[in-house]
Structure formats: C-alpha cells, structure tokens
C-alpha cells in the first residue's frame, strides 16, 4: 500500500499539534507458574518473572518512539489476578505481594502495574476476601500498584456482598491515603475484560498466553480538530469524519504494537481503541462532544453525542486492525479531562448525567471526587447502579471514585500528572444502607441465557 506525502504530513500534524500519542504499551504476564504455599517463595517467583519478561519494555518503547516520531507515554505491566495466585499461601494479608509488584515494576522502570485483583462476580473465595481486605494497606504502602475487583457480569448477576465490601474498602482507602489518592488506583468492574492495557483496571486474564503485548492509543485532540476542520453538517457526516479519523489513529497503534511484539519476542494481543483524555488543553473527550454542537458537555444531547462518538470510533478502528480488543471506546474520567473538569465546575455535568453517559461509552464513572463524609453504603450504591447498567446492557462498566477526606462540595482536589484535578461533586442525600446491607446476589438478567 503506497503512502502519500499528504498522509505523512497529516501524521506529523497529529503528533505536533493535536496531542496524538500511543498512551501505553502493556505487557500482560501470567503468574500461575509462580504459585507456592510459601508466601516468601511466591514473592520471589513473582519478582523474578516480572523483571525477566519486562526488562526490555521501557527501552523498546524509547527506540520505537524515536524511530517513528510517535510519543509512547506509558509502559505498563498487568498480571494474573493476585487472589488466584496467592490462594495456596493461606496468608491473612497480601500486602507483601503488592509491595513485591511495586518493587518489580520500579526495577524495570514502568509507570504502573495492575493485577492486584479479585474476580468475585458470583461469590468470594477466602483468598478473594483476603485480597480485597488488603487493598487499603496495599494502596497506602505502594506507589504504582493498581487494584481492581470484578463484582458482577451479565452471566452471573451482581454479587452484592462484594459490592458492600468494595464500598467499605474504598472508604477505608480514602481514610488512610492523602486526599484519598489511593482510591485513584482502585477500579470496581462489572463485565471486566481480560486484555485491558489501561490502568487502573488492567489484569492479565486466565485465558491469555504466558505473556502478551496490548497497546492503547489516544487521540481526542486529533478527532476534535478533524471535526472542526471538516465540512460536516449533519450528524451522519460527523460520524463519517470520526470513523475515518479513528482509522488513521488505529493504524499507528497497530504498527507500534506489531513492532514492539517483534522486538520483545512476545505475541501481539490487542489494540485498545479507547479515547483516553488528559488534563492538557486540546486533549479532551468533552471538547469533541462540544465540537459536535453542544454548548457544554453534560447538557441535554450529551449522551446521544457520546453514543455517536463511541460507535464511530469502533467502526473506524475495526477496519484498521484485526486485533481490536480491551475496552475500545471513549473514556470519560472527570479529573483527567480538561473539558469535563470545566463542565463539572459549572454544575452542568453531574453524577447523574455521567451515569447516563456510561450506558453508551467505554467504561463508567471514572476519577470522580466526592465529599469525604460520603458513607461507605452510598459508595456501594453508586457501584451497584453502575454495575446494573453493565449487567443489563452486556457491556463493561466500572467505578473509580475518590472520597476526599476533609473536603466538601465547592472544593477541589489536585492529583497531578495524568490524573489531573477534580471538583468535589455532590452525591444524593437519601440513604441506600438497608438495600446494600441485604447482601446476596442480584440475579443475572434473562439476556444472560444465550445458549
């Protein structure tokens, strides 16, 4: 396939002027062969495997970035859910394993490591419960370890005992980490995927290879500029512009993924098409929606605009790569998106509207700061609502919520870097405590029976 000079110039512009980057190259690593009944032996095995397989990742990313002139922002590791790997130890805490993950990730120079996780959509094993109860201390005593809990699925329903425990875990983490920052590294999922390269929800699924390369691209700024410079008048034409631009973005990610796999001698897994914003001006998903004709993200019509965007990105990306996977859509993390921050500060973008938007976008309620006085059962209720959307619609949904101790509505919290800052958003005054405390399981919906 010949490449026109105009296409080369277009790619250079995407990088130089529109904040285009490859957001992450993530190596997924299977840890089943590290299992030992001795937790010290387990920790030693985990450290050795991660540092052996991941030792060249950062250098490879630098070489590829220099070769193609494409910024590769993060290099990350995901591992098999630790609740599965640590079960044989019968330990009453897995904090030491989190600390081992932290040391291993720092030793090879990656930015985050995910997989301090438990999959409890249908029930909790003793190991799952130990892991979840270890999360607050693990987040407090590590820097770059990320944790996730899958509490529901379309096939299993929603495990409300796990939802209750997840709410309590998030609240406890907020209380013992500065400004609740530990909660920025915890995601609670429904229908979690096994090949997600993005943090904080990445883990290496049991059905994956021993090691795999997954790539996440990002180009909100590219899409916004494409829309602003197009002659699109109808929404049909808008969708076409998004689709064609997503194709171009995806081709770059595919190239980087295939090259990284070749250099590292690790199979290429998937390319995640998700539009991942940053707090930088010109790198916002909210501003794409506004470029479609909304005066501000969060006003009426926002959910429809986001649905159009998400679907068109998928269609364009699927044409460009046979390896599309992960979450693949649009992320709407409030603190990480300059346009979302502005909309939330104006009061137009509310928690309720964000919940509606999650029914049509990539993940869920992401990087939302709430008052520190928010009770655990309210957090559990928010998680249950979000999980219900995912369960009924057969899609991945998630909650990454930060109760900021000592702060209330009208104030804001600064996380720094890619995590940005967030205004404290109000939650409902009514109580769901009795509902959450009932426990049990919300049964799987009728659409789960597909065989």
UniProtKB/Swiss-Prot annotation:
Residues that span the membrane, as ranges: none
**Pfam families assigned to the protein according to its UniProt record, in alphabetical order:** DUF711
User: What InterPro entries does the record point to?
Assistant: UPF0210 (IPR007841)
What is the top-level taxon of the source organism?
Bacteria
User: What family does the Swiss-Prot or TrEMBL record give for this protein?
Assistant: Belongs to the UPF0210 family.
Q: Assembly state and interactors?
A: Homodimer.
What is the name listed in the Swiss-Prot or TrEMBL entry for this protein? UPF0210 protein APJL_1516
Give the source species.
Actinobacillus pleuropneumoniae serotype 3 (strain JL03)
């Amino acid at each position: 396939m010949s490449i026109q000079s105009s296409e080369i110039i277009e790619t250079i512009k995407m990088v130089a002027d529109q904040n285009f980057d490859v957001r992450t190259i993530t190596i997924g690593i299977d840890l089943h062969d590290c299992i030992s009944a001795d937790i010290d032996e387990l920790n030693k095995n985990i450290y050795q495997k991660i540092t052996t397989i991941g030792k060249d990742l950062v250098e490879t990313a630098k070489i590829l970035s220099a070769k193609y002139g494409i910024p590769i922002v993060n290099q990350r590791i995901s591992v098999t859910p630790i609740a599965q790997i640590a079960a044989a130890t019968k330990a009453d805490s897995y904090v030491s394993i989190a600390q081992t993950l932290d040391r291993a990730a720092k030793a090879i120079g990656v930015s985050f490591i995910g997989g301090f996780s438990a999959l409890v959509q249908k029930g909790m094993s003793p190991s799952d419960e130990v892991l979840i109860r270890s999360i607050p201390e693990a987040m407090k005593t590590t820097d770059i370890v990320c944790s996730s809990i899958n509490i529901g699925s379309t096939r299993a329903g929603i495990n409300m005992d796990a939802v209750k425990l997840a709410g309590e875990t998030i609240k406890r983490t907020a209380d013992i980490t500065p400004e609740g920052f530990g909660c920025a590294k915890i995601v609670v999922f429904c229908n979690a995927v096994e090949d997600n390269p993005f943090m904080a929800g990445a883990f290496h699924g049991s059905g994956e290879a021993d090691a795999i390369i997954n790539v996440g691209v990002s180009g909100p700024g590219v899409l916004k500029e494409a829309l602003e410079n197009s002659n699109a008048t109808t929404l049909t034409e808008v969708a076409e512009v998004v689709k064609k631009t997503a194709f171009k973005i995806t081709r770059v990610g595919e190239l980087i993924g295939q090259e990284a796999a070749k250099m590292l001698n690790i199979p290429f897994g998937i390319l995640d098409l998700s539009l991942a914003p940053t707090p930088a001006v010109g790198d916002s998903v909210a501003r794409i929606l506004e470029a479609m004709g909304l005066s501000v993200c969060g006003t009426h019509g926002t959910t429809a605009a986001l649905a159009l965007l998400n679907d068109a990105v998928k269609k364009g990306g699927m044409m460009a790569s046979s390896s599309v996977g992960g979450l693949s859509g649009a992320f709407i993390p409030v603190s990480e998106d300059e346009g979302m921050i502005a909309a939330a500060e104006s009061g137009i973008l509310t928690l309720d509207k964000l919940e509606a938007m999650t029914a049509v976008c990539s993940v869920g309620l992401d990087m939302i700061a709430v008052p520190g006085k928010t009770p655990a059962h309210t957090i559990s209720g928010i998680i249950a609502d979000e999980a219900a959307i995912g369960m009924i619609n057969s899609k991945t949904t998630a909650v990454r919520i930060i109760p900021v101790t000592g702060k209330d509505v009208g104030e804001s919290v600064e996380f720094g870097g890619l995590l940005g800052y967030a205004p404290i958003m109000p939650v409902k005054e009514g109580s769901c405590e009795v509902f959450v405390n009932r426990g049990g399981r919300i049964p799987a919906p009728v659409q789960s029976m597909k065989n």
